[in-house]
Amino acid sequence: MNQASNFNLREEIKEYWSMRAATFDEQPGHEIFSEAERSAWHTLFERHFGKGDGRKALDLASGTGVISHLMHDLGFNVTGMDWSEAMLEKARAKSRQRGSKITFLLGDAENTIEADNSYDVIVTRHLVWTLVDPAAAFAEWFRVLKPGGKLLVVDGDFVSPTWATKFNKAMAGFLETLGLRKPVEAIPQMQTHQDILARVHFSNGARADAVEAMLRQTGFDPIAVDFDLKRIHSAQKKHISFAKGLERGAQHRYAICAQKLLET
């Protein structure tokens, strides 16, 4: 993909997420819908980062500030960055309402323009699978992390069909044949999303081993891959349909913690 194509795709992605901002928090898996889920996220972050103790954290593609607030709960000095002003407006309003001292910046996760060695930790949720140039993004994140700092990537393969997606599709077709279910009409937003995802780097799905290998090539070491996200997903399932819950449980989801070595 050439530079011009990259630019056009990135603009499409920015426009898409700006369009989604108004309803983003209504969907389970975006906003937190229970204290059980909040606690599960806190546990994940503490497992890899420890307590905040005023350390500087950067939440990339921060959206409406969900992860930023979870990190703030743990005592981190949080900066959220997103390239959608519509998302940032939601995040700032939420921060004012909750009285949280979080800085929200308009910026690009692949080119943050932040100073070298400026953050103790970086966190991303469901960003990597949508990146146009993940190698460039990882190099940028490595640059802005302090020596000894940690990156936590929470992501998954949301593209490859699983047994659950195949089962749900077959059941939907069967029920439609019996006249017990109306055919689902295509949603324009969903088609736009699919068109975009067909052109990103991980268009066939962001598998943990591929992301880990790319992080290692960037210079991160050590790297730990964590598949123990059951508490988060169990809490989310209580707020979605049975079919969606099956799909979510069958997906390849993970958290990868990667460290920037201390300078010697």
Per-range role (PLM):
Residues 135-147:
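A short glycine-rich, Lys/Arg-flanked "PGG" loop and its adjoining helix->strand segment in the class I
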